[in-house]
Amino acid sequence: KTFGGRASGPQPLVDLFTYAVETFRGAAGRRLSSLECHDLACKIGEVVVVGGVRRSALISLSNPSDGRLRGAKSGQWWLTEGQRALANNSACYTEKPEFDFFLSEMKALYESKSGERGIFNRQAAQDIAAKNGRRDPAFDFGTNPCSEIILRPNQFCNLSEVVVRQGDTLKVLKSKVRWATILGTLQSTLTDFRYLRPIWKKNTEEECLLGVSLTGIMDHDTLNTPSPLLVKWLRELKEVAVETNLEWSKRLG
């Protein structure tokens, strides 16, 4: 009766096995389609639950020309393919497509009424990674499910969330950012992924990412309105995160 306090039992896993067997049998003699692979990944995410609470998030990056994924959330998909709710979907390109692509993509997005697919520019991700000189841009980057963080293949994000309350002062927010940064810095050292391939550990340790995010900004008068004061606050909060990370990185060696 508490959050995360009750086991889900074996049924979600049984459902996954049944779904996988049916999918493979339906594709006998051929390769799985991109949409079948997408659905199978979503189904795996669907069974990652604790106490009936979802504990997974996915993003599916597909070729611009992939019509199957473009239409994955068109019509009343939730009635027959409910697992697709687990993933955000985006078209991923490395070279600027022709105008026709954007036109057809926006038309499909509007007609689906789901707000998807999004668009992810891999070349822009490489340019941003190279911009500050601290990351190796020579990767086919993807992104985390909410698309805040550029990621290598086989890599985790490391995001700590600050909950903003309506009456929070700058001093209160700085304190929250400091604690979130401490948690994130500690979490960045947890790289013993014993059930994953070594490449996951290598990438996570090499980049040692840290992200501190603000949620609830629309409830706060300063944070929800573009202004010079907002810019000042955000810069000061960023400085707190950077300084706290440096302090705790030294402590941790």
Residue ranges and their predicted role:
Residues 13, 33, 37-40, 102, ...:
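Active-site-proximal structural scaffolding
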Residues 43, 53-55, 87-88, 102-107, ...:
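Short, well-ordered loop/turn elements at secondary-structure boundaries
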Residues 1-2, 111-224:
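Function-dense linear segments that define catalytic or interfacial modules
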Residues 1-39, 128-131, 135-140, 157-161:
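Catalytic alpha/beta active-site cores
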Residues 95, 99-106, 111, 118, ...:
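Conserved mixed alpha/beta core segments that line enzyme active sites in large multi-domain catalysts
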Residues 52-96, 188-201, 205, 209, ...:
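Internal maturation/activation junctions in enzymes
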Residues 1, 39, 43-60:
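N-terminal nucleophile
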Residues 11-47, 90-99, 105-109, 117, ...:
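Alpha/propeptide regions of enzymes that mature by internal proteolysis
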